[in-house]
């Protein structure tokens, strides 16, 4: 079945809301944090059964082992042994981000194009690009992208779109927005010919231009998408992103879930959940964990700092995750990082992911109490 979305409580203080998304593979309480499992695995974490919704990257799975191979094995849920909801992207984000470089402060599309681009050609039909593994020439069109996501069998899928860097000129920016909506319509048509149990979110582009964001909202509202996803360039920093998210959500109807693509650090969640965002995806918690940044109820902990060398206190006294329940001290975890013990990143990742789930649980509670 396609997803069902219910608003359980609308805050009296803001546009924030508590909701529930029902899929064939389970229920997602919203607002929700969605960790990114790039290759079908959360880095540093083996057990993902307590993660309500997990984000997998079509591009990487298309390159290896191949989406047709995964389909032959029964789909992504069976392949990675997960009996809970999965969302996949179109593959476009990875293709364009590999070409245009890294992102800053989790705000997408701010960077300069690399000298050696993985993109060979962008046409109205799709994009030709080189595999990051072996340089093999590949083609991704709306239909190819959706078929790949059909092969994977994710519960929520995303239409193909073009991700532009922040510094694109106005003429190309406008033509890219137009091409993206043509691609999304083709993606939706292909999906609706064979919907299966899957749902598709329409992606809203428009950069930081309020009028273009309004046009993007009108496009997704006019088509039978099952949910909305805010994508494209969101500015160069948090201060630029907040008004973009505010004005975008103000143009959306309230009957469908809203996802903020690629944004999931704590400051961004806290700044935008009040606008009615229902889910956030990011690799931030596991990436931070691998670099020794521990998220805690007492604030972020840079565990490698000398201050923790003899600190036998628990990592987070209020946390009940496996790491904290194992009574690991801050001094011991610091030691593991200092000697480059692989377990360090594992313990930290387990904790950070649990912390994010607790943060979202608390946010839902605050919304129910009309505190957000």
Curated annotation (Swiss-Prot):
Pathway noted in the entry: tRNA modification; tRNA-queuosine biosynthesis
Active-site residue numbers: 89 (proton acceptor), 281 (nucleophile)
Superkingdom of origin organism: Bacteria
SUPFAM superfamilies: tRNA-guanine transglycosylase
Gene Ontology terms: biological process: queuosine biosynthetic process; tRNA-guanine transglycosylation
A GO term for molecular function: metal ion binding
EC number: 2.4.2.29
InterPro entries (alphabetical): TGT (IPR004803), TGT-like_sf (IPR036511), tRNA_ribo_trans-like (IPR002616)
A Pfam family recorded for this sequence: TGT
Catalytic activity line of the entry: 7-aminomethyl-7-carbaguanine + guanosine(34) in tRNA = 7-aminomethyl-7-carbaguanosine(34) in tRNA + guanine
Cofactor: Zn(2+)
RNA binding: annotated segments: 262-268, 286-290
Oligomer status and interactors: Homodimer. Within each dimer, one monomer is responsible for RNA recognition and catalysis, while the other monomer binds to the replacement base PreQ1.
Binding site residues for Zn(2+): 319, 321, 324, 351
Binding locations of substrate: 89-93, 161, 232
Function description: Catalyzes the base-exchange of a guanine (G) residue with the queuine precursor 7-aminomethyl-7-deazaguanine (PreQ1) at position 34 (anticodon wobble position) in tRNAs with GU(N) anticodons (tRNA-Asp, -Asn, -His and -Tyr). Catalysis occurs through a double-displacement mechanism. The nucleophile active site attacks the C1' of nucleotide 34 to detach the guanine base from the RNA, forming a covalent enzyme-RNA intermediate. The proton acceptor active site deprotonates the incoming PreQ1, allowing a nucleophilic attack on the C1' of the ribose to form the product.
Descriptive protein name: Queuine tRNA-ribosyltransferase
Family of this protein: Belongs to the queuine tRNA-ribosyltransferase family.
Species the sequence originates in: Chlamydia felis (strain Fe/C-56) (Chlamydophila felis)
Cofactor info, note text: Binds 1 zinc ion per subunit.
Record keywords, A-Z: Glycosyltransferase, Metal-binding, Queuosine biosynthesis, Transferase, tRNA processing, Zinc
């Amino acid at each position: 079945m396609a997803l069902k979305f219910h608003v359980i409580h609308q805050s009296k203080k803001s546009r924030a809301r508590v909701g529930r998304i029902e899929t064939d593979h389970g229920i997602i309480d919203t607002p929700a944090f969605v960790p990114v499992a790039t290759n079908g695995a959360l880095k540093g974490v083996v057990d993902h059964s307590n993660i309500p919704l997990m984000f997998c990257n079509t591009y990487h799975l298309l390159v290896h082992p191949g989406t047709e191979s995964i389909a032959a094995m029964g789909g992504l849920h069976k392949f990675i042994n997960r009996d809970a909801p999965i969302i996949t992207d179109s593959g476009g984000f990875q293709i364009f981000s590999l070409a245009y470089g890294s992102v800053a402060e989790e705000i997408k599309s701010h960077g300069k194009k690399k000298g050696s681009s993985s993109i060979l050609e962008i046409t109205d039909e799709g994009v030709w690009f080189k595999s990051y593994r072996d340089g093999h020439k590949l083609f991704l069109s709306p239909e190819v992208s959706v078929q790949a996501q059909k092969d994977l069998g994710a519960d929520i899928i995303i239409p193909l779109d073009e991700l532009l860097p922040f510094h694109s000129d106005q003429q190309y920016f406008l033509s890219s927005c137009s091409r993206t909506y043509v691609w999304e319509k083709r993606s939706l048509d292909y999906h609706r010919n064979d919907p299966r149990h899957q749902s598709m979110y329409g992606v809203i582009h428009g950069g930081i231009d309020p009028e273009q964001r309004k046009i993007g909202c009108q496009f997704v509202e006019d088509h039978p998408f099952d949910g909305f996803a805010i994508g494209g360039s969101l500015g160069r920093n948090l201060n630029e992103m907040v008004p973009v998210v505010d004005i975008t959500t103000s143009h959306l109807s309230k009957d469908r879930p809203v996802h903020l693509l690629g944004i999931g650090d704590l400051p961004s969640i806290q700044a935008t959940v009040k606008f009615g965002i229902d889910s956030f995806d990011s690799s931030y918690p596991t990436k931070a964990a691998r670099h020794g940044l521990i998220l805690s109820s007492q604030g972020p902990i840079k565990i490698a700092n000398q201050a923790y060398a003899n600190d036998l206190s628990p990592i987070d006294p209020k946390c009940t995750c496996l790491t904290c329940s194992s009574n690991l001290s801050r001094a011991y975890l610091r030691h593991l990082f200092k000697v480059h013990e692989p377990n360090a990143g594992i313990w930290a990742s387990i904790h950070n992911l649990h912390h994010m789930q607790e943060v979202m649980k608390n946010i839902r509670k605050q919304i129910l109490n009309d505190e957000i």
